[in-house]
Amino acid sequence: MPRPPLPAHLLELLRRPNPCVIATLRPDGQPVTVATWYLLDTDDRILVNMDAGRRRLEYIRQDPRVSLTVLDGDDWSTHVSVQGRLVDLTDDNDLADIDRIAIHYIGHPYPNRSRGRVSGWIDTDFWHAWGPGAKPQS
């Protein structure tokens, strides 16, 4: 699998509010996947945000390796998957990070203001892309 940086056409795919799935590892090594939102924060870091009470947060604290697969919302046969580590876990006390992600996806701040949130950034180690939209346009 290629290492970063990702090519410009894949960064463009990641800049859009596409559907995606994140995989974490349970302590017994079993992978767990869940749909999530993300935001390409810089060209090599992806922001994700979790409810502070979610079990996957415990898994990430024990083993920060994750995989994120982003599907092109216009053609789900096109996708990019990144494997890396979820780093810099921080409490999102003022909900600024989840609001940035929510505005990206739904156009307004995150509606549930009563539960704690935690932000983390995926540092990409490897990536893989597939499908017509994963190839550079000539």
Residue ranges and their predicted role:
Residues 63-64:
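Ligand-binding loop in jelly-roll beta-barrel domains
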Residues 1-17:
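Extreme N-terminal tail/first-helix region
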Residues 1-5, 77-138:
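Charged, gly/pro-rich active-site loop segments
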Residues 17-52, 67-70, 81-82:
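Short beta-strand segments
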Residues 28-30, 73-76, 114:
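A short beta-turn/loop motif at secondary-structure boundaries
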